[in-house]
């Protein structure tokens, strides 16, 4: 399967390194806003083709799957371009800036009979099944609460600090905390409350409380100006689970009701962690599927809708590029 990368920034580098270490997929083409930038990227990371415009790459019939690596403010516009050009799409999180854009893309993909999926890597990683299996075993009893945080000192990064790039902590890192809670507690959400500290028009530190059916709750924090331990805790009636780094789990530890460690699990070695979403796309395409089981379209729309509601409660409106 030949991969085309749309955009040549930092996250594109990670995907290029990932694909270079995989079997049955190929770093084939990269497109940037200038040919010189694309050519330099292609030479450094071993791509066969470099294009100085997105349209040129999308016209290449050899491209099987496009990975969108641009700021999420432009995901809708770029994903739409890909679909209209007949390309399958793996779009970096946050998938779009709102649920309405996500619905439009999924409808277009269905019309074009193409695969499109959100590249939120934690949904595809082996650690997800490891956590599910621990919970299913009953060792921690009935799960009633989740606490998670994800904060990075990235407030000066352009995509974070600029409202016109859909900046702020929520869409960039908060999406991981909401997905972490959702993977554990499900989709039967009753209420969401959130507060934030804003700087220059974007949210820099957010706290989110989510209440689910069955009297279960998630308490989440995300931020773009401080460092946190990135921990996730899953609390049950007989014990609890601690996940070291919810953004790329490094260790999963199980404790009993006496706070004694009873088991610890290490996720398998990986290239970067991005390989799992690429593998999921390859499987789905080979099987004629139009979405990945790991991140169904309905779930992307649901999570985007949660974030829409949070921003609405803050009065934060994001410019749309459509």
Please place each PLM-identified region on the residue numbering.
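N-terminal Rossmann-like dinucleotide-binding module
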Residues: 1-45
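Beta-loop-alpha module in the N-terminal Rossmann-like domain of NAD(P)-dependent dehydrogenases
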Residues: 15, 48-106
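Hydrophobic residues in well-ordered beta-strands that form the structural core
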Residues: 51, 91, 116-118, 243
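C-terminal helix-rich "cap/oligomerization" subdomain common to oxidoreductases
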Residues: 65-67, 213, 280-322
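Rossmann-fold dehydrogenase core element
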Residues: 103-121, 141-146
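Predominantly a Rossmann-like dinucleotide-binding segment in NAD(P)-dependent oxidoreductases
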Residues: 122-193, 198
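Contiguous beta-strand/loop segments that form the cofactor/metal-binding neighborhood of enzyme cores
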Residues: 179-251, 268, 280-287, 321
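Active-site loop of classical SDR/Rossmann-like NAD(P)-dependent oxidoreductases
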Residues: 265-279, 295
